[in-house]
Amino acid sequence: VDMGVPELDPPAIPFQATEAASLYDIDVNGQVQRIAAVSMGNPHAVLTVADINTATVAELGAALESHERFPNRVNVGFMQIVDRSEIKLRVFERGVGETDACGSGACAAAVAAIQQELVDSPVTVHLTRGPLKIDWKGAGSPLIMSGPAKTVFHGRIRI
């Protein structure tokens, strides 16, 4: 799937910053967190963590989601670098909480990791519901996302 060109310019994300950078320091409840800010049509903050299994996704995700520097709120990705070709990711989605999968979040994490030269492209992003492969050639280029599609719910509605 062509996911489009990621937006890295702070006003377009929207994110309040004086200039564009690959990482930003942001105060969250008295502690400085280092984040990447990316828009994939929706805003994402991506943090690199040592272990996604011990990351405080609910607490820190909620605090960042409504941070004043993101006027439209933000999705928060907790990214663990496995090696140059793999990332593990948990996503706290704005207005929802933690989700099992997030294509735009996987793309935002890939952009953040590639920009910081932590991984190469293509990179596999492992989410709870399965892996996604993200290919990005760099600034100004669209991201290509591929992965399995699975049914997670069947239902009926009477109208």
Region annotations inferred by a language model:
Residues 104-106:
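Helical hairpin unit composed of two closely spaced alpha helices linked by a short loop
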Residues 1-101, 111-159:
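Active-site proximal loop and beta-alpha junction motif in alpha/beta enzyme cores
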